[in-house]
Amino acid sequence: MAPGTLDDNSADGSEATWSEASARFIAHLRHERGLSAETVRAYAGDLDQFREHMNATAGTADPRLSQVDADAIRGYLAALHKTRKKTSRARKLSTLRSFYHFLNDRELVRENPAALVAYPKLGTKIPSFLGVDDVFHLLDSLNAGAARAGASWRRCRNWALFECMYSTGVRVSELAGMDESDVDFHEGMVRVLGKGSKERIVPVGGKALDAVKLYLRVLDSQFPEARRMGSALFRNARGRRLTTRSVHRLLRMELRRCGLWQHLSPHGLRHTFATHLLNSGADLRAIQEMLGHSNLSTTQRYTHVHVDQLMKVYDAAHPRSRRDRSGK
């Protein structure tokens, strides 16, 4: 073993330095979990910031794991109180918990001091949709994990699952209820069985279709017997149909995995789909059809469009609009 590295067979991993343990954890995130470079940098930055805090408060430039306890972590979060939002402090605590969970799993430490520290209360306001950049970050992170050599069929499934949800705007129950035969790869459409057993046809994008193709190919390779367990498109670890609860859990896991801390539900991805289409100038009636809404008023509640964006769409589309809104 090279000097300054952490060995799984060490007699007492708690005597390893923070930098040694951090390097091992970051390598795990990069090579074993296949996280994006941006997400890995965020984890590394959080761990470095804690080490710098320990240096400033305890005079230890590179503390040993045995020197860090729950009180030290509470002191760190308290020091961030004036300069960081609650969501930022919660993310940094989550990084420390993940770090110690990794070390616990490898029996390099006996306790997880971060697990003894409560998360800051974030309130009850739940964002109902994601911005375009955040959606791309989520889906690109899932894509990177699925494209990694040796990726499991479940990693590929998660990419396909959320690409399809964002691409089609279907309800979580409709997504979980899809069969393989509902996807028309040639026409780029999916058949959806909605509320009241009403069937509709919805376009699906090329990225989502590519993700589904990869998922099915890897599923056949790694879990060939799954096809004998029914016709479901998206399957759980036993090969059976995913439940809506599982989709909620998987989205929460993948959001955190890629460093997004919004409390977003699968229903929020449906809102996101509708909002992004309307922001780009799509017709509200067409969005209504794709969402499977009976009333246009329901579709309107799904969209979160800024006034300036509405003005741009209006000015571009209406033949008698005022092109100059400067007042001249």
Swiss-Prot record:
Family listed: Belongs to the 'phage' integrase family. XerC subfamily.
Keyword Cell inner membrane: no
Species per Swiss-Prot/TrEMBL record: Syntrophobacter fumaroxidans (strain DSM 10017 / MPOB)
Pfam family, one: Phage_integrase
Source lineage: Bacteria, Pseudomonadati, Thermodesulfobacteriota, Syntrophobacteria, Syntrophobacterales
GO molecular function, one term: tyrosine-based site-specific recombinase activity
Name assigned to this protein: Tyrosine recombinase XerC
Domain Core-binding (CB): from-to ranges: 16-104
Enzyme active site: R171, K195, H267, R270, H293, Y302
Keyword annotations from UniProtKB, A to Z: Cell cycle, Cell division, Chromosome partition, Cytoplasm, DNA integration, DNA recombination, DNA-binding
Annotated Tyr recombinase domain residues: 125-315
GO biological process annotation, one example: cell division
